[in-house]
């Protein structure tokens, strides 16, 4: 005896990506509001917000309201 209960059948291991596949945040768009692409002086800013620094619009990833 091999000690396996499903001998001869395909054994399915735990899906390590199951949490990612069923992430409840994916169903709630309000969670992603701070991670939208904004126009920052003609340059897309994907991870934050646009701030004027030294007279120029620059993409910032911190200090975003």
Curated annotation (Swiss-Prot):
Transferase is among the record's keywords: no
Locations listed in the record: Secreted
GO molecular function terms noted in the UniProt entry: ion channel regulator activity; toxin activity
Keyword Transmembrane helix applies: no
Propeptide intervals in chain numbering: 1-36
GO cellular component: extracellular region
Main location: secreted
UniProtKB keywords: Disulfide bond, Ion channel impairing toxin, Knottin, Secreted, Toxin
PTM comment text: Is not hydroxylated.
Tissue specificity: Expressed by the venom duct.
Stretches for region Disordered: 1-33
Disulfide bridge map: 40-50, 45-59, 49-64
Positions with biased composition (Acidic residues): 14-26
Function statement: Probable toxin that inhibits ion channels.
Domain notes: The cysteine framework is VI/VII (C-C-CC-C-C). The presence of a 'disulfide through disulfide knot' structurally defines this protein as a knottin.
Name listed for the protein in its UniProt record: Conotoxin Am6.4
Protein's organism: Conus amadis (Amadis cone)
Highest classification ranks of the organism: Eukaryota, Metazoa, Spiralia, Lophotrochozoa, Mollusca
């Amino acid at each position: 005896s091999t000690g396996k209960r499903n001998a001869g059948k395909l054994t399915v291991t735990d899906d390590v990506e199951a949490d990612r596949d069923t992430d409840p945040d994916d169903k709630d768009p309000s969670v992603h509001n701070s991670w939208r692409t904004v126009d920052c002086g003609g340059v897309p800013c994907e991870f934050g917000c646009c701030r004027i620094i030294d007279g120029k619009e620059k993409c910032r990833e911190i200090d975003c309201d």
